[in-house]
């Protein structure tokens, strides 16, 4: 749920609060006030997790709506997608009502989960693939934003999403390049960590994004906490007991085993 160096759910809540202060209607009943509530609402519906596919999505983009857009694409663009995913009618992610849109609708604001770039077990490879075209549902969700929801401003929260990594040219994108197919002519704002100008430039150059740099998070000394901190103390005491108080070892061993069982770890 987090972008690099930013708490994405908490940042999304902040953005929603700023929009509300600016007079944007967010609804009154279902608006989450904190990040845990936001994530709970998102995960109560359909997400990219296959185990959630029995849940209802936010909406559907009907196939006939998608086909009207599809027929306007260049033959080159259609061929690139069809070679990997087949025609829209053959799409593995097509349902009876159309292509599913995953997320929440809060008044005039849609908070969506970016679609998966592919359906391979190794999602990381799909995310960064220079050759994998976007599936039909990926394109359909962005089309829903543009033509059904009527989005006037799009915000991708945190480094980095997948739209700017879709196949195509590095600069001077053509009508067949993936980012242009997905993002459409919608103003695009992208909060991005300041210490990665290279990938920020990628989003700016290929995703027509206005980059809003944010600082890196403050650093702190890492350490153990909770049960792990107690385990460390018991292990230190056990090492000392083996040297000076062997009779104490049996008691410590039992305490360590109980703690490991509580952590659901195998004991010795």
Regions found by a protein language model. Give the residues of each.
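Ligand/cofactor-recognition surfaces for anionic moieties
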Residues: 1-268
